Regions:
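Conserved ABC ATPase "signature" region
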Residues: 80, 115-118, 124-147, 187, ...
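The feature captures the beta-strand-to-loop junction immediately N-terminal to the Walker
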Residues: 49-51
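Helix-to-loop junction immediately C-terminal to a conserved catalytic motif
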Residues: 64
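ABC ATPase nucleotide-binding domains
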Residues: 105-117, 269-401
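Conserved ABC transporter NBD signature motif
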Residues: 72-80, 127, 196
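Glycine/charge-rich catalytic "coupling/switch" loops of P-loop NTPases
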Residues: 3-4, 426-476, 505-534
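Conserved coupling/switch loops of ABC nucleotide-binding domains, chiefly the family-specific signature
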Residues: 68-73, 107, 122-128, 381, ...
Length: 534
């Protein structure tokens, strides 16, 4: 992979993934990403969100190594990876399409990448290697029995459902001969189901055994000892970085790198080698992923026998078995229906937490961003607009674009003139802003008022008493009743205003109502720069 920009910076100490001044320019001269800077801590769930063409997927593909970085620097777990091939970056990617092999079972789909690729592996000392191999052998035997009983349990569940359907059919059959025939079939099913309780008991027993040996294996790995060495390759990279920093006159940074070099030259780290996993190791990883994703009963099925949600779990499982440093997800839920998307959102977050993973997730759906992210990166036309927690983004948008993009229904915007604490709208409506809201800030004469639908309240309530100067009269154009609340659509200064109001009493179309703004939660934007004033 080509990159004209060599190492200039090092990865910040508390950063697990660091993108520094990343640009992407295609051969036709189109620039997709501009000066992208982001430091991601270990175990964070970062969401890139924005409209189509904003550069979010391009940035993700540069992280994966599927797109060349035109300029800038990328670090993963302290390693400079601009020139590292995708397969050697130790990342796992989940795409919008499930990308499953239709002719393979779920088990083989999960195991395939482990069979064909060499995996970065720490080299255990002989004694610990023998101990861990022994536990892995025991656990593999239990998994083999567990898979067998799972298959038997699945078959018995099908028979049980068949019996229930037959009993239901029997109640509606009036023909005596047909009824007798169905009763015989039910009797045959009863014989086949005679040991269903024993199978359930064995399933629970093996389930406990899996937990027992899994805990033993985890404990053994946590206490294991590995072959250690001084990482000469890392030391060489640091020496190059020091030389480059000095050649650019950055003595402060050079000294910081010298401290890091001294530590690297005196601190042994585990020896890591690329090797093919054994059959036992692959089997353990597959069953571990299937157990986490609750798809153990589907291991022998082909993808065509699975629902959309189950296929997406298998796609996630293919990433999990890699034991990757970073999970990259490119709109993985966009092929699912609305109900399943909600379910899978929570499952992905649970999975992220269970694995203590570091996840970077791309979506155009602001609901996914708000409900899943530790931090959100909002993008527009290749530029970062704002980085922050969901709460920060929602409450303190950086500019007009962010304010309008986040929130459903979207924030209402109205042009206004400002003078001496008073907003004057195009229809000459005036709203006086409290001094506490202005708080000494400089406000230009031309502004845009932003107010969220949920911050518009009835004109006879508590907020109206607090902010009587914000009361306005509206004529209802549309009244959408959503059970406990209304979405009221009205015309205000030639624009559609949406208010989210509790459904305490009926509201009819063409009715005139009074509402007020919660002036503590409004936003003002500079009409020229579109930046948020407050």
């Amino acid at each position: 992979m080509e990159n004209t920009n060599r190492i200039v910076l090092s990865c910040p100490k508390d950063s697990y993934v660091s993108l520094q001044h990343i640009d992407k320019i295609y051969d036709n001269g189109v620039q997709a990403v501009f000066d992208f800077n982001l430091d991601i801590k270990k175990h964070e769930f970062i969401v890139f969100v924005g409209p189509s063409g904003c550069g979010k997927s391009t940035t993700l593909r540069m992280l994966a190594g599927l797109e060349n970085i035109t300029s800038g620097h990328l670090f993963i777990d302290g390693e400079y990876v601009n020139d590292v091939t995708p397969k050697d970056r130790n990342i796992a990617m989940v795409f919008q399409s499930y990308a499953l092999y239709p002719h393979m079972s779920v088990y083989d789909n999960l195991a395939y990448s482990l069979k064909i690729n060499k995996i970065p592996t720490k080299i255990l000392l002989k004694e610990d290697k023998a101990k861990i191999a022994s536990i892995e052998g025991e656990l593999n035997y239990v998994y083999k029995q567990f898979r067998k009983i799972n298959k038997e349990k699945d078959e018995l569940n099908k028979l049980s459902n068949q019996k229930e359907n037959s009993i239901r059919d029997l109640e509606s059959i009036k023909d005596q001969k047909k009824a007798e025939k169905l009763q015989k079939e039910i009797a045959k099913l009863d014989k086949k189901l005679v040991n269903i309780n024993e199978v359930d008991d064995e399933y629970e027993h093996l389930n406990k055994k899996v937990d027992e040996f899994s805990n033993l294996l985890q404990e053994a790995k946590e206490n294991a000892h590995y072959e250690m060495h001084i990482d000469e390759a890392h030391c060489n990279e640091l020496e190059k970085a020091i030389e480059f920093a000095r050649s650019n006159g950055n003595e402060v940074h050079a000294k910081e790198l010298e401290v890091a070099l001294n530590k690297a030259q005196t601190t042994e780290v585990p020896v890591t080698k690329l090797k093919h996993l054994s059959k036992n190791e692959i089997n353990l990883r597959v069953h571990e992923a299937a157990r986490i994703l609750q798809i153990e009963e589907y291991l022998d099925r082909k993808p065509k026998a699975l629902s959309g949600g189950q296929r997406q779990r298998v796609a996630l499982g293919r990433a999990i078995v890699r034991h990757a440093k970073v999970f990259l997800m490119d709109e993985p839920l966009s092929n699912l229906d609305a109900k399943l998307r909600v379910q899978m959102r929570s499952e992905i977050v649970r999975l992220h937490n269970d694995l203590n993973a570091t996840t970077i997730y791309v979506t155009h759906d602001q609901t996914e961003a708000m409900t899943m992210a530790t931090r959100i990166v909002i993008m527009k036309l290749g530029h970062i607009q704002q980085i922050g927690t969901p709460s920060e983004i929602y409450r303190n948008p950086a500019n007009l674009f962010v304010a309008g993009f986040i929130g459903s229904p979207a924030m209402n915007f109205f042009n206004a003139d400002y003078k001496d604490g008073i907003l004057t709208f195009e229809d000459k409506t005036k709203i006086k802003l409290p001094d506490a809201v202005i708080n000494g800030k400089f406000i230009p004469s031309k502004v845009i008022l932003g107010v969220r639908p949920e911050d518009i309240h009835p004109g006879d309530g508590e907020h109206a008493r607090e902010f009587p100067e914000s009361i306005i009269e509206l004529k209802v154009k549309v009244a959408e009743l959503l059970g406990s609340e209304y979405f009221i659509h009205s015309d205000f200064n030639g624009k559609n205003l949406i208010a989210k109001i509790e459904a305490n009493k009926p509201i009819a179309v063409d009715e005139k109502i009074k509402v007020c703004f919660n002036l503590r939660k409004i936003h003002l934007f500079d009409i020229e720069t579109e930046k948020c004033i407050f």
